Amino acid sequence: MIAKWSLGLIAVLVGVLLVYAFAVPRPFDTTDPTIFLQDGRSVNYCELPELDGSGRTAEEIPKAYTPGCSYTKIPMPILADCTEPLAEGVVDMRGLWLGVSGRVGHLERIEQCGNRVVVTAYGIIHDFRVDGTLENGARDVGAICNNFSTAIHFDDEGVMVFRLFDLFDTVFREMRGTEMIFTFIDGIETRTQRICSYPE
């Protein structure tokens, strides 16, 4: 009897997740369309914005979303004009990162200001706050154009933790010296090193 109830509960949970993944409408798109007018490959990502509070705040810049199921042209940096200093407890991971071990060739761009982070990789824009809430977390599309929602926070050791639906940890990012370490749910640890421009 318990096994029957357990299977029923699992079936309901899977059904709810499938409805959320493929039937629930995406949020209203607030992306600034100008980020797609130029090629993000043209930027020197070793020249990071000075977070001295002289420019715009994270709140003043519209949240960006992935267009459709994936972008086809690398967008310009979303937080380029933001100079809000990083919030307390937020580790500076800004830059363009290339995997040199684990998932060799893994490539992602990280932007930060205040408690806001934008990770751009594999055709997806993840724009979120690191406050540990689903409301301000990453509301994105996945590899098969599915909806998903993630709460993100920095733990006490400075690791950025992605919690899918705020239920379980799926992705981890942390700094070790000058390298950014990316670890996926499968346990594969990828060492990434900073590069200044997108590879050809």
Which ranges hold each PLM region?
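Amphipathic/hydrophobic helical signal segments and adjacent flexible N-terminal regions
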Residues: 3-105, 198-200
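Short beta-strand segments that buttress and anchor functional surface loops
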Residues: 97-99, 118-121, 160-165, 182-185
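Solvent-exposed loop/turn segments connecting transmembrane beta-strands
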Residues: 103-106, 164-168, 188
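N-terminal glycine/threonine-rich, aromatic-flanked beta-hairpin/loop signature
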Residues: 103-147
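Aromatic-rich beta-strand edge motifs centered on tyrosine
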Residues: 111-112, 172-177, 194-197
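Acidic, glycine-rich flexible loop segments
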Residues: 146-177
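Short, exposed beta-strand-loop hairpins at the edges of beta-sheets
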Residues: 172, 180-187
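C-terminal, beta-strand-rich globular interaction domains
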Residues: 183, 190-197
